[in-house]
Amino acid sequence: SNGGSAYNILMDLTKLEAPFRLEAVGLVGNDFNGIRIVDHCREAGIDVRQLQMIPDIPTSYTIVTSVKQTGKRTFFHHRGANSLLDMDHFDFRISNAKIFHLGYLLLLDRLDEIQPNGRTKASFVLENAKKEGFLTSIDLVSEDSDRFTTIIPCALPYVDYLFLNEYEASQLSGVNLMEVTDPAEMDRRCQDVFKVIFRMGVSEWIIIHHPDGVWASHRDGRQLFQPSLQLPQEKVIGANGAGDALAAGVLLGIHEGWNMEACL
């Protein structure tokens, strides 16, 4: 099926009947998958003026394998057209949107490039969005590398809302949130994560999603926890897109002026 951060969030917002216009920005190949994505967005009423189809490179795709008993997933990703997404593909002046969401950092080769001044192109895209009056939001991808600390921090001063899972939070902050079973210990470690990442520059909220629930913290020190909804196992087909679904719901609430308790 179609997927990825931008597509999933747009479609989730469509299903949530978001009372505002949705816009897609990105690159797809001039192939079956690219045509299907653009057509589906159009059918959903999404503005595709900045969703460009380019020749001679395939649409990005991911093969996901999932262990049914544990839910553990392995991703095989081909970057394709996403690898060419660059600063000049974003024109914030023609957009009427309120929030700009960029995902996933660490999967967008040109935007992840570090420039001579030590900043990534993604950081400049986010800065430009802020200058045009947008609220900014980003999501990361889980990978086993040291790139979290070399690529992500320079973008965070231009980010209002940061979404990440427990693995990504661990990699970015250096505080281990993995396989923590004691709720009190998890709360304590999340507080440490928030302190580290806020020092990197996030302006508003950091939101960590985890199988047990969501931890969120505002720069002013407010902290929230929302437990997960426990569904019967037979109702769970898979976890793909779960983080994007959470982000879509939270972004809908932010757009409509809800407090974070209601968003979560």
List PLM regions with ranges:
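Glycine-rich phosphate/adenosyl-contacting loop at the front of the ribokinase-like
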Residues: S1-E43, K72, Q233-A239
